Structure formats: structure tokens, C-alpha cells
Amino acid sequence: AANRFPQRMILSHRTKIAGVIGWPISHSKSPKVHGFWLNKYKIDGIYHALSVSPNRLSQALKGIAALGFRGVNLTIPHKVEAMALCDKIDETAKRIGAVNTVTICKDGLLSGTNSDAYGFIENLYNQSSWTASLGPAVILGAGGAARAVAVALSDAGVGQIRIINRTRERAEALIVDTKIKNAVTESWKSVSYTHLRAHET
């Protein structure tokens, strides 16, 4: 009789283990995306979704190194906090002030980088209708991903970047930390739907 149960992946000591850490994590499409490419290229690997609360992030990163993970991606709300937990940070992550990828070095040290800026701006460049001269850009939020987007837009030559966050102090800190000179903050309460549509990119 045909096996009614799906065949499970058989893991071995050679299986490459990676994942994504977030809180919550149910929204992440990363496991499906990475799983697709692992399967397509017949890579002996597995990619987990890992639900980790902010107060357990340090333990989690130490744990993945001990368990033989190759590395992890980071999503909300860990990108900024993970900076202080990495042993090494590359220049891109330092400038953005957040990491979205942590790899485990052969010596067990944690190395942080950030690919959000590159991924975001490359997607815009692939849109034939987009140019940096279209007008002001509006960023909602001031977390790790917003930092990367702000840096990418500034480097691309966008004339003005307007950062809107529930707490204005955090938006101002983003500008100071990333040293972006063409960015301003606006109050969340002062922005209407019409305003956002007018500046949509």
C-alpha cells in the first residue's frame, strides 16, 4: 500500500541548519522561501522558524552556535538588539545600526551583517518606473528594517526622506545614528492617508 504519510527529511551530521528568529515569527515567509531553494538545488539543509522573546535573544544566539547552526536571519524585534550580541560586525551593519543576518564562524564567534538595504534598493531599481528623483520618500517606523531602508534611499540619492514613528525620539535617533543628512522626522498624528498616498513610492 502507498505510504499515506509524507516522507520526512533525514538529518545527518552533514545537514546545514539555519533559521529565522523573531517574536512573533508566524508571519515570516523565510522558511518557505529558503526551503524552496534548498529543495531546488538539492542542498542538504533545513531552515527553521524560531520564536524567541526579546529577553531570551542572548541565550538563543549562544544556543544556535552550540547546536551547530550555520547561522540565522533576524526579524522583528531583534535586529537592533542583536548588534550588541555579535562578536564581529561588518561596516554595513555598523552604519545601519542593525543586523539581519548572524553567521557562526569556525571559531564559534557570531558575525553580524545586514542585507536589508541592498535587498530593498535592488528591488526598487528593478521597477522601471522608479527613480530617486520622484520626490520625498516616507518611511513608517524607525526599527532595524527602517534604518536599512533609510540608508539605502539616502545612498540612492533620494532628495528627502521623511521618517514617521509613534515615538518621535526613536525616529530622531535613527537619523543621528545613521548620519543621514537628507532626512526629517514628522509626527505620526500629523500624517493623513491622503498625505501618505501623495508621497507613495
Please give the residue ranges for each predicted region.
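Conserved S-adenosyl-L-methionine
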Residues: 155-160
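Conserved small/polar residues in nucleotide/adenosyl-binding loops
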Residues: 194-201
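Short amphipathic alpha-helix with an adjacent loop that forms part of the alpha/beta core around
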Residues: 189-193
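Short acidic-hydrophobic, aromatic-tinged amphipathic segments that line or gate anion-handling sites
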Residues: 184-188
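Phosphate/diphosphate ligand-binding glycine-rich loop within oxidoreductases
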Residues: 12-129
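NAD(P)-binding Rossmann-fold cofactor-contacting core
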Residues: 161-177
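Glycine-rich adenosine-cofactor-binding loop
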Residues: 22, 114, 134-154
